[in-house]
């Protein structure tokens, strides 16, 4: 069973939902894997904490690049069966990096003194500012997301005027004149960047 925490729509699984997934996985003899590319955001927005993942999952990984790491994710294998031969499998499939220990230094730094969690909180706080500001302008959201991904429904004419200044991904055409798009905040998003986007949205409304 493969889950993303948070999901591609910015939603999060609660501890209760992860416990239910664990029970289903056990019932059918399946393993439970959690993709944690954006895990820092989920740990801020969900009641499912890092210790819960360690208790409930067979494997999960701690995302690094979305928290400022240059490369990589930290795979955490809890199921003893899956540890056997894992290093050799990585090497055989071309995933063993020379001097890979240098990648580990990034995670040692990220997990020291709560930095990883603070970066996740920073992303979520900026996303909430963006979400609340968009709502205050009278725009709707396609998805109710508590994490760093926000999905406003904006007029195509507004998006056309914003495209040279901002970056987003189009998710779905809502009708002939509106599109649901995805804005993502990052560990380095500043207050003034959110303010500038909201000001431009207000000006173009």
Predicted regions, residues:
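Active-site phosphate-binding strand-loop segment of PLP-dependent enzymes
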Residues: 1-36
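Active-site C-terminal subdomain of aminotransferase-like
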Residues: 1-13, 49-147
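Active-site-proximal loop/turn and secondary-structure-junction residues that shape catalytic pockets
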Residues: 7, 38-40, 66, 187
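Alpha-helical scaffolding segments of alpha/beta enzyme cores, especially the outer helices
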Residues: 16-23, 27, 48, 52-55, ...
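Short, solvent-exposed amphipathic alpha-helical segments in soluble enzyme
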Residues: 18, 76-79, 91-92, 166-168, ...
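Structural preference for beta-strand elements that scaffold enzyme active sites
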Residues: 31-33, 59, 180-182
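Glycine-rich, charge-decorated loop segments at or immediately adjacent to ligand/cofactor-binding or catalytic sites
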Residues: 40-46
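Conserved C-terminal alpha-helix-loop-beta "cap" of PLP-dependent enzymes
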Residues: 128-203
């Amino acid at each position: 069973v493969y889950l993303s925490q948070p999901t591609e729509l910015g939603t999060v699984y609660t501890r209760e939902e992860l416990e239910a997934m664990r029970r289903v996985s056990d019932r059918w003899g399946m393993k439970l894997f959690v993709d944690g590319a954006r895990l820092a955001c989920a740990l801020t927005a969900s009641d499912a904490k890092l210790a819960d993942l360690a208790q409930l999952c067979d494997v999960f990984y701690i995302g690094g690049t979305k928290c400022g790491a240059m490369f990589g994710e930290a795979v955490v294998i809890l199921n003893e069966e899956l540890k056997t031969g894992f290093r050799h499998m990585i090497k055989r499939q071309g995933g063993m990096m020379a001097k890979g220990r240098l990648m580990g230094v990034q995670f040692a730094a990220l997990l020291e003194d709560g930095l990883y969690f603070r970066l996740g909180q920073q992303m979520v706080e900026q996303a909430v500012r963006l979400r609340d500001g968009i709502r205050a302008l009278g725009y709707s959201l396609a998805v109710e997301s508590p994490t760093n991904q926000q999905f406003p429904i904006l007029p195509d004419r507004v998006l056309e005027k914003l495209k040279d200044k901002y970056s987003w991904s189009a998710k779905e055409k809502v009708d002939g004149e509106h599109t649901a798009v995805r804005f993502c905040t990052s560990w380095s998003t500043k207050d003034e960047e959110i303010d500038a986007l909201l000001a431009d949205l207000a000006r173009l409304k």
